[in-house]
Amino acid sequence: MELNILSKTDNELEVKLKGETHTLLNILKDLLIKDQRVEIAFYDMKYVSISDPILYIKTDGTNPIEVLKDAASQIISQCDEFTDVFSKAVNA
């Protein structure tokens, strides 16, 4: 994965996630729109097989980079939780 910041202001962030698909972007978007600091979160992928998605975040004034970092941390926590639950189920 390669992430390029296309634009950033105090409350907006637009990033291109090279090589990513709907899988990661849907998870990020869903977590971001549940965050009370986020006013708008969406991504655009013009052509699924040949274009890289662009994620857009607008916050209430909170640093959008911190908001995106928090969403990434939540994904890691959810994956860790799934790994634990899955391991217990398999070993039961």
Swiss-Prot record:
Cross-referenced SUPFAM superfamilies: RBP11-like subunits of RNA polymerase (SSF55257)
Alphabetical GO biological process terms: DNA-templated transcription
**Localization (cell):** Cytoplasm
* Keyword hit for Transferase: yes
Q: Name any one GO molecular function.
A: protein dimerization activity
Q: What is its EC number?
A: 2.7.7.6
Secretion signal span: none
**The entry's keywords:** Cytoplasm, DNA-directed RNA polymerase, Nucleotidyltransferase, Transcription, Transferase
A GO cellular component annotation in the UniProt record: cytoplasm
Chemical reaction(s) catalysed: RNA(n) + a ribonucleoside 5'-triphosphate = RNA(n+1) + diphosphate
Which PANTHER family does this entry report, sorted A to Z? DNA-DIRECTED RNA POLYMERASE I,II,III, DNA-DIRECTED RNA POLYMERASES I AND III SUBUNIT RPAC2
What is the protein named?
DNA-directed RNA polymerase subunit Rpo11
Organism, as annotated:
Methanosarcina barkeri (strain Fusaro / DSM 804)
